UniProtKB/Swiss-Prot annotation:
Superkingdom as given in the UniProt entry: Bacteria
Positions that bind Zn(2+): H78, H237, D241
Coiled-coil zones: none
SUPFAM superfamilies linked: Ribosomal protein S5 domain 2-like
Source species: Acinetobacter baylyi (strain ATCC 33305 / BD413 / ADP1)
Pathway linked to the protein: Glycolipid biosynthesis; lipid IV(A) biosynthesis; lipid IV(A) from (3R)-3-hydroxytetradecanoyl-[acyl-carrier-protein] and UDP-N-acetyl-alpha-D-glucosamine: step 2/6
Similarity remark: Belongs to the LpxC family.
Cofactor: Zn(2+)
Official protein name in the record: UDP-3-O-acyl-N-acetylglucosamine deacetylase
Keyword Zinc: yes
MF GO annotations: metal ion binding; UDP-3-O-acyl-N-acetylglucosamine deacetylase activity
Keyword set, alphabetical order: Hydrolase, Lipid A biosynthesis, Lipid biosynthesis, Lipid metabolism, Metal-binding, Zinc
Length: 300
């Protein structure tokens, strides 16, 4: 039986909030079977918990925010992507502010931290959401589409008419597995345009943004001295974002995902469209690990 996963032990770290610019503590704690992914605001008294649920998502500026009444946890997509990449089902994430720390702008640091906690199998079957028929979400010329597929394939295309974005590197496809995610996707950093930064900071946004946690792009190209980690790092990061956004449905999805200029809002709308009709999907488990179309890292 393919089993649910959590961590063996608590892992603690800290980083800078992308928008606040303040230090944020983040702790990863084991969670119970079928507990799902839960964010806990420990800076509040009493602490407030918010389930990682697509129906609680509100988009802020270029990030996904979980909102429960007047409490939010923002910039969750990179840590959610790492959790999905390792196949973790149940986890409590404590944060000391209203946003998850940005780390280096990728999911790589979160992969490292989670592995320090050691993956632990639980005595319950791992659940998957299998898409049974095509579902789409459209906004203007942007689109996000699920079609039935034996596995989890992500095809993504961005469209930037800019010297930094070579045409041949604006599309990418991956067949999702832990190995592919860790080595080919998790290190791809978020990116932004330098011309937007002054405006954002004037509006108390992106106060923590720097070339240590993002790829900066000016009128001619990439500003970072080290350049890109991958020739197609921009589109790989959009895949990273999509993996995190789509994991907010509560379980790993079995389907093909096609995104064209899709962002957090459209990815979330796609999940809502799936959930609007129960005939769009079914919950499946695998008694034999060999029958699972998605390969995860082995748990010792």
């Amino acid at each position: 039986m393919l089993k649910q996963r959590t961590l063996k032990r608590v892992v603690k770290a800290s980083g800078i909030g992308l928008h606040s610019g303040q230090k944020v503590m983040i702790n990863f704690l084991p969670h119970t079977v079928d507990g799902g992914i839960v964010f806990r605001r420990i800076d509040l008294d009493p602490p407030v918990e918010i389930q990682a649920d697509s129906l609680l998502i509100q988009e802020a500026f270029m990030c996904s925010n979980l909102v429960l009444e007047d409490v939010k946890v923002g910039t969750i997509e990179h840590v959610m992507s790492a959790i999905a990449g390792l196949g973790i089902d149940n986890l409590i994430i404590e944060v000391s502010a209203s946003e998850v720390p940005i780390m280096d702008g990728s999911a790589g640091p979160f992969i490292y931290l989670l592995m320090q906690g050691e993956l632990h199998e639980q005595d319950a079957p791992k659940k998957f959401i299998k898409i049974l028929k095509p579902v789409e979400a459209l906004i203007d010329d942007k689109r996000a589409i699920f079609t039935p597929h034996e596995g989890f394939q992500l095809n993504f295309t961005i469209d930037f008419d800019h010297p930094a974005f070579a045409k041949e590197y604006q599309s990418a496809t991956i067949d999702f597995s832990t190995e592919v995610f860790v080595y080919e996707v998790s290190g791809a950093r978020t990116f932004g345009f330098m011309k937007d930064l002054d405006y954002l900071k004037a509006n108390n946004l992106a106060l923590g943004a720097s070339l240590d946690n993002a790829i900066g792009v000016d009128d001619t190209g990439v500003v970072n001295e080290e350049g890109l980690r991958f020739s197609d790092e921009f589109v790989r990061h959009k895949i990273l974002d999509a993996v995190g956004d789509l994991y907010l449905m509560g379980h790993q999805i079995i389907a093909k995902f096609d995104g064209y200029k899709s962002g957090h809002a459209l990815n979330n709308q796609l999940l809502r469209n799936v959930q609007s009709d129960p005939s769009n999907y079914e919950i499946v488990t695998f008694d034999d690990i060999k029958n699972c179309p998605i390969q995860y890292v082995h748990v010792a």
